[in-house]
Amino acid sequence: MNYQAIRAALENPLLTAFNSLVPAVPVFFDNITAVPANTTTEYVRINITFGITNEPTLSSSVDNARGALIIRIFTEKGRGPARNQTLLTTAVNVLESLNNTAKPATGTFMRLGEINGPTFSSTDEAPHFVGRIDTGWVATVLT
């Protein structure tokens, strides 16, 4: 199983989209970076979980895996939901484009399920307004 290829298929398009915004929005992944402590700036936190990673196939040249993708958008609290919703729209557009990508002959083929959310939350203590979406995914690594 090629976990890094699956992560890259999800992470790279999201990272590119948020880095292309003006100003660029920092993205933190659960596998390589940590969110800065006590930050009041906006940022995106992406978590990828693996569920079934040994789904049987008819060929040894194909690996199938399933899991979940959770995207949290953190924006400055007290400024309204508009910026958070704009960043969530960026994430949703990327996820929808992944479902419209043709199946390659080699590499990683990714399909996402229904997108849940957005849901919004904030606490009295935290400096952020948080928007969240999540979805299940199915990946096929073709060799």
Residue ranges and their predicted role:
Residues M1-S61, L98-T106:
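Small/polar-rich, solvent-exposed N-terminal microdomains that initiate assembly or binding
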Residues N2, I6, R83, P127:
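Conserved acidic
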Residues L14, I48-F50, R66, L88, ...:
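Residue-level detection of beta-strand scaffold positions
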Residues F50-N54, K77, N116-T119:
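Short, well-ordered turn and helix-capping elements at secondary-structure junctions
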Residues T57-S59, R83, T143:
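Short, charged, solvent-exposed linker or helix-capping segments at domain edges/interfaces
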Residues S61-R79, H128-T140:
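Oligomerization/assembly interface segments of phage tail-like spikes and tubes
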Residues F74-V92:
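Mid-chain, well-packed structural core segment of small domains
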Residues V92-T143:
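Acidic-leaning, charged glycine-interspersed low-complexity segments
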